[in-house]
């Protein structure tokens, strides 16, 4: 069972001025005396298998370069840019770092994840590749290699140009023990065998295996700003704790817009390098995004009702139908807009999960019987009031990998009893529970 392919949201349009933010307590300021440039070069030299320096003349002549420019636009030209979007977060971020200790926090997407651009992104509707930082790319499946050309106008949020050196430095960064990120260390160690620089805007990445989705392993990566991490060393977590890493996206955080423990405000770059490019020009419309800490769910709801927060995702039928019904004066009066919309993205794999190594559950007929005995539609109709749809598989929403021919097993007591009988449970005990010849009850605890 999963959420229907859609969201319910409450939209509240308010006109408000953002109060001034300040009082940022930065733990570290840039130290111009530190420069790890030589260490980086030495690392490249020590790994000639991983880092290759070539020339444009070394590029294969038969490469087929793609630009992804034939897909439909994203967003609407009628959307007005400007204003402030007010959002709540459950807790103040423990760090502004994108990598390393404590960096995987609940509001990470709002802080930077929503705005960071990889080399290439999938179109949200067609799933086809469209340009991010890359201007074009070429896939050499036979040699497990992807070639990438950087858009020469691409810049970091601090206005420094993005170059192939930042692509190479990403490998130094994510392989480094300084960042204290074992997953990243492991991923870059095991999935890639080489990165080759051809010029300031052209490079290639070689993967270890030619998987069906091999191209994504290169295209969905992104650069790391080498100039920003010249101070990278053993004190990385502390040194960069409250320093916002430049990225290629539309929003940035200024030190003056950090009110520790209270709020963080992001600002849109008015001269963002991609602001007039297809696929990006109708996105990222607010000038500012105000993230205020509201820890308690009831307080977040009240803040929304007051107009302090612009939108609230509704996760329960009780909230949608009982707490804020269509007859509510604010809804009926047009002050709050309730909206339901659908998408075709990956679904959360909600369901009843069984440990097949446990006693009784290690019998396939028992597991199949449970499938047929579980009345999910009753749960959907009564508990979720019909606002859910059952998953067809445990991983729906992956177009190239989800099998459209798989159907969930229906609620069918007769079939359930057949499978339970095949597992030896043919009689019922005094309490009505099925038992086998040894008197063992077919009962489980969730």
Residue ranges of each PLM-predicted region?
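C-terminal motif of bacterial Sec signal peptides marking the signal peptidase cleavage site
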Residues: 18-20
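N-terminal lobe/hinge region of extracytoplasmic solute-binding protein
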Residues: 52-73, 82-141, 172, 246
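Surface-exposed binding/hinge segments that line
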Residues: 78-80, 184-233, 239-241, 250-257
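Short, well-ordered beta-strand elements
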Residues: 82-91, 135, 145-148, 167-170, ...
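Gly/Pro-rich hinge or "lid" segments in bacterial periplasmic/extracellular proteins
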Residues: 104-105, 110-117, 121-125, 220-288, ...
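Aromatic- and charge-enriched surface segment that lines or borders ligand/interaction sites
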Residues: 135-180, 204, 300-303, 360-362
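Extracellular/periplasmic solute-recognition and catalytic clefts
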Residues: 176-184, 194-197, 254-265, 292-358, ...
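Append "and occasionally in soluble cytosolic enzymes with long acidic Gly/Pro-rich linkers
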Residues: 267, 361-446
